[in-house]
Regions:
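Conserved donor NDP-sugar-binding/catalytic core segment of glycosyltransferases
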Residues: 90-126, 352
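A recurrent flexible, glycine/aromatic-enriched loop bordering the glycosyltransferase active site
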Residues: 67, 136-157
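Glycine-rich, basic loop-to-helix element that forms the pyrophosphate-binding segment
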Residues: 59-76
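Short, well-formed alpha-helical segments that are part of the catalytic scaffolds
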Residues: 10-25
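A short, conserved alpha-helix in the catalytic core of glycosyltransferases
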Residues: 148-166, 171-199
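S-adenosyl-L-methionine-dependent methyltransferase catalytic module, highlighting the catalytic core
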Residues: 170, 327-362
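Short beta-strand-to-loop acidic/aromatic patch adjacent to the donor-nucleotide binding site
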Residues: 79-90
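A conserved acidic beta->alpha catalytic loop
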Residues: 36-44, 62, 260
Length: 362
């Protein structure tokens, strides 16, 4: 495995990261590729004084994340798994081994990320404390959770996925959007992405933005819209709504979501109810294409009332911030009752336009 670390004015954090990788995971300098993306803190001179270090210097600085990673892969002819790191994410004991174990637990798993412990959190107040707690077994492992999107600053990518998905999209600039695109491409090719419940990294500082700015964010958003025909990529489940599903974990639920988007709510159900049968309806064909990798998804408009679920009835029908967009929400609810199992429930959330989070920005 090769570790690619992209740094911008993070010299001290980078030194800490390199030492932690050596001490806690046995990763030596020959397995590292350090990219200095225009730092002004002495990183370049330090790299040039270390003959055993693999590194790249972006003289002008502000190179796109996609171009950096693609160039590093090509320059060093990487033909193995890759761990992409931002220096603000510090390795904790056993995390690399646990991520690798999960990565190869199933051939369909293409990439994994650790759980993140944030600086100053109740779990561990600082990095030294976090290391001690892991070594003493005070931070318990959790369930592995399948994800739609992985963090751009700490992700392990399997060689087979890298080869099949190909290069990172060089039209995109910001790391988070580059990873957004790569995750979607991987999912559509049949790969699964996971957060490893037994691997932990510590976010010791906020990510440096370098010369990234709003212009790059707007440009990326426009390019993603053109490529995927989606205004945004929702990878955060509506846990407030989904918390009303209270059956035991092994219950073979049948769940339908109207307006399922890319399937993040249905994926939450899959993670918490592995025996559930999942169905979705989504009007956006691109979003449905992603959701189809998770559930049985129909592309269509629920208000046309021509759905055919093959006689299946559902324990739950979910409307997450959907009803307010319909011409006839009451009629649609009455129509969907036809597919509701006796004793089943409709779960719906409707945004409150008078909520302080909306009003304060007016």
């Amino acid at each position: 495995m090769k570790v690619i670390i992209v740094a911008y004015n993070q010299f001290e954090l980078l030194q800490m990261e390199i030492e932690a990788l050596r001490l806690l995971a046995g990763i030596e300098e020959r397995d590292l590729i350090i990219v200095d993306n225009g730092s002004e803190d002495g990183l370049r001179q330090w790299l040039e004084e270390r003959p055993g270090m693999n590194y790249l210097i972006c003289d002008e600085g502000g190179e796109s994340y996609s171009a950096i990673v693609n160039y590093a892969k090509a320059e060093f002819q990487i033909a193995e798994d890759i761990l992409l790191l931002n220096p603000c994410y510090m390795i904790l004991p056993d995390s690399i081994e646990e991520m690798q174990r999960l990565l190869y637990a199933d051939r369909e798993i293409g990439a994994v990320m650790p759980k993140l412990i944030h600086n100053g959190s109740e779990t561990a107040g600082n990095y030294t404390e976090a290391v001690s707690y892991i070594q003493e077994g005070k931070i318990a492992s959790e369930v592995n959770l399948q994800q739609l999107k992985l963090t751009d600053g700490c992700v392990m990518l399997k060689r087979s996925m890298l080869e099949k998905v190909g290069i990172f999209e060089e039209k995109l600039f910001l790391a988070e959007n580059v990873m957004w695109d790569y995750c979607v491409r991987g999912i559509e090719l049949g790969y699964k992405l996971f957060e490893c419940g037994s691997a932990f990294f510590y976010q010791i500082a906020e990510k440096q933005k370098g010369k990234e700015n709003k212009q790059h964010a707007l440009s990326d958003r426009r390019l993603l819209k053109e490529k995927w025909d989606m205004n945004y990529f929702n990878a955060i489940p509506n846990t407030g709504l989904l918390s009303y599903i209270t059956e035991s974990r092994e219950t073979p639920l049948r769940v339908l979501e109207i307006g399922c988007d890319c399937g993040v709510n249905l994926l939450w159900v899959r993670n918490h109810y592995p025996n559930a049968a999942l169905y979705g309806v989504e009007i956006n064909a691109s979003a449905a294409g992603v959701a189809k990798c998770i559930a049985n998804v129909t592309v269509g408009n629920i208000e046309e009332r021509q759905m055919d679920f093959g006689g299946v009835t559902f324990d739950y029908i979910i409307f997450g911030d959907v009803l307010e967009h319909l011409r006839d929400p009451e009629g649609t609810l009455n129509y969907c009752k036809e597919f509701l199992k006796k004793g089943g429930s409709i779960l719906a959330s409707i945004p409150n336009i008078m909520h302080v989070s909306v009003v304060r920005d007016l």
